[in-house]
Amino acid sequence: MKQENLEKIIAFRHVLHEHPEVSNHEEYTRKLIKEFILNHMKSYLVFDEKDWLYCMKPYQPEKKTIVLRADHDAIMNSLNTPFHGCGHDGHTAILLGVMLEEEKKESEYNIIYLFQPAEENGSGAAICKPLFDKYHVDKIFGLHNMPNLRKNVIYYRPETVMCASVGYRITLLGVQSHASEPEKGRNPVYALSAFAKAIEPLAKQTGFQPFTFKNYHFSSLAMITIIHMNVGSLNFGISPANGEICLTLRAAKENELSILERYVRSYFEGLKEKFEVSIKEFDRFDENYADPSLVEKTIMKLKSAGLEVEQLSEPIRASEDFGYYKRFAPSMFVFVGMGACPSLHHDSYVFDDEIIPTAVHMFQVVIR
């Protein structure tokens, strides 16, 4: 990578880092991205779609089309203020670095540079669907930085790369009574506690081996994490009527996430004689799946270009909304190791600029 371009990109990454914006609120971030492109590059068309943007050189319909995607939203830290604790400022800088390096070069492909919002809550990829309605996309690539993997090594997997997941907020409404007469009410605490105990085995599933849970068979990892639970309020005279439990359901395979969902919904449907039941869904993420044929061809290219690559032994348990794009084109998602450093979403996390040249080079190789 040209030193001049690297210096521009690092400086801009630091600007983004100082102006973090959470999912669905990244207006100023996109303004900065757009200004950087217009100020430093003349060969690209910039398509501002209000909630997202993409760039490309003039489209040539006779060519195949590749999409390179980067996210740009931030998260909240423990002080409840936005910060770039997942490195999306770095992902954006990497994509801009590829654009700088490729500006004067010809390609046999149409290359679309997609700047996606709102990855953290799972809504951003779907927001960008009009891009895939407008263009026939032949391949799409994405990446994520990864602390505590060897620095500047490209990590990959065919098939499942990251898990599918969804959040559920379940509320129960029974009947309130005096705390001295709990038998005259319907307190949801026991129903919620029984459910929490029932799913305890699913909270301990950490591996990707087949297993059976209550006559449901899973071929790989499936788990439920209780992230919040609440009943009543701090009032010693009341046996409460209201309670809620919030869950993250997660599975390596989308069809097996559906099995978890059926189990949870069936469990609470069975409580409707005693309680009013509400189930709301949040933050749905598709399985992040890498097309095996595309992976094989791409890894051969990366090795030939001198990049160090390593196959992950198993998928990452976390989710990434890049998985949505497999609906439209063969996709591949990789990780760039950052070496020993604080983990993603940790308050002390900072993106490491030293992986930018490797990541830019990797993207340049895949579009050749």
Residue ranges of model-derived segments:
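Divalent metal-coordination and catalytic microenvironments
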Residues: 16, 68, 88, 113, ...
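Histidine/acidic-residue-rich, glycine-tolerant segments that coordinate divalent metal ions
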Residues: 56-57, 73-85, 89-90, 105-228, ...
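A short beta-alpha structural unit
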Residues: 225-232, 248, 277-299, 313-323, ...
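Oxyanion-binding "anion nests"
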Residues: 228, 235-279
